């Protein structure tokens, strides 16, 4: 029986044959209507009735065996024997499929029975990383009894395409899932696309946890090789305590952690934050002399309010919480420095506490929060003070002695080309733009094609004359955009056979029930060109690709083959298509949230830990005066502002060959190749020009985006790129002294007139023409060295006019009379945004070193 589903599951129709379903779908012009092959058989439920007499649910999960050597057909056969006996007694049915070391399992039964069995599976020491791929109601059983016979992939099929794609996508899928925020990961696993979900207002308790004086720790010349160790410790401590208390970690921002809880877990949140402070304070007694983690201390701010849970951006996305309350939380965290308190929380948080915890609170303190006209009431618990100046003095006096970190920092340009890691996308761009402000060029989408082009540049032996000993295997899975008839498949087969024979590509294309699975072998360049053609094929969608290390010899014969999976595989295991479909969609969606360098390295069969530390330039962008703009804006307007901003930034950045490091609401950080500073300047020019033209396009409309202005800062220096975390959540960090310094350079965009929209700290890496004619020095200096701005009146930023325009917008929308300019000058007493600790992105340690003026 075949089932056709459309209108997001609201309409369902069954057919006896696949041709009937395909004809009905084509005649009805349904573009998004998946078809499922289902075998329904009677079975006895745990309550003794038929499967129609009880509510059935189908649970599908992926796990990894803790001992891959034992995950062989004999091991799976023993699992089948035991599971058949036990699960038949309670009325469970399903199948188990193995592709060592991964296990795919679908279970059907009642809610109570499934919950009980999955709890046992999760606690089974033979499994780890149990990931739920699907958990939804079903109308009938695919298997009348517990079916595990011939469940090993080697037994059910001889097609290497199926074994390859399941193993490779499962490996990359489970690895990349650790980089995703839990909310986005849960949506992907439930079959939802986070980008398609509408923004959801939520009442949450939010915290920002800072590593005290982390910028100074990065700037210390004796600790530049230890940031990875410091951050890995910080990530592990936060994950253990925050997630253990029911919190959800939204993101890590170098030395900062952002997390949230539901309002009924406020006491658990404060307890977890206090425990983090205590755990870090105990590190000095547990570390070897000269180790940087002995200098780790934390300070946190906690606040409660309404925020918008939403997806911002398209090409590169950030699934996060947005809202004015989020900015206020980060400002409360910066006040902890002034009050020397490890944990500081607002009056709204205090109202959510029970009587017992309220009795422990010290007296209230009223203080001015940056960006707010009205003071904020804060509270703290009694305990030892956390003096930032004392911590800074310890860092200045720090010497590692004989202690040496295992991670060595090297110069990217000094490495031989064959040994350089593929952390930069230097693929040819479509229609390169001239280096002139405001020049429009066709945007190049950043997709999974780019990492696979980068994969072709990985170091490796050259292709031999025959191409048979060094050919890599590339696999992909995709969905047909329309029903494929035998004539369509014959046309695909004829074209593929002719073209691939000329390119010396061999492999297998498997088709069944609207699903394409393909593995191919051949020269790298030919495979990449073929992949590009596949992605441009309008007959396919949701193309998810993966890559295997190079085999010693070809697996496939010289002839290209096409196999119909309907008769040989999918008819035997109907859920197999569902497994592949869900893995493909989730794997494709992950790329927008996971750093591209991680995707490219994982899909090339490498470990991200092996990425060598390099020296590179850093660019940082920021929406100026966002706090005063969002203070009187609704949550949907905040989301609209950040969504527009995040869409514009990665487009301009990736177009110039850079990589996005982090999307942080109204801030985007990225890195450029150290030898291509001119591209960083061109990207900054495009961003500022886009913002100006966007404001001009809606100048006659009362739209909050009409007051948005960008400030862009450029700096270069040495950073460490490393994978941090071992407690289930992984963060790929890019950290160095330049990470903190570029934030201070960005503060020049709000300095005294003229305000430079694109300041840069060093001009050493610019081309002679741009250095001599394209930049001018600024009055401000950082660390005794001059800063520069891009020449031209169009690149000056008038913050006073921006703030005046914001207040005029709010006054016009509320029906009030706008203030005149003299009155505005008298009343404009808001301290605005000081970049030391701004929005959860500022390191506390860099304060007091600069001579720049901030508002």
Curated annotation (Swiss-Prot):
Start-end of Basic and acidic residues biased regions: 813-827
Chain ranges of the BLUF domain: 56-149, 471-563
Repeat keyword on record: yes
InterPro entries on file: A/G_cyclase (IPR001054), Acylphosphatase-like_dom_sf (IPR036046), BLUF_domain (IPR007024), Nucleotide_cyclase (IPR029787)
A molecular-function term among this protein's GO annotations: blue light photoreceptor activity
Keywords noted in UniProt: Cell projection, Cilium, Flagellum, Repeat
GO CC, alphabetical: motile cilium
Keyword set includes Isomerase: no
SMART domains: BLUF
Localization terms from the record: Cell projection, Cilium, Flagellum
Principal place of residence: other
Example GO BP: cyclic nucleotide biosynthetic process
Region (Disordered): 420-444, 813-855
Signal peptide: none
Residue ranges, compositional bias (Polar residues): 842-855
Additional remarks: The 1224-5/9F strain is deficient in phototaxis. It is not known if this is due to defective adenylate cyclase activity or defective BLUF domains in this protein.
Subunit structure: Heterotetramer of two alpha and two beta subunits.
Protein's name according to its UniProt entry: Photoactivated adenylate cyclase subunit beta-like protein 1224-5/9F
The species this protein was found in: Euglena gracilis
Gene: pacB
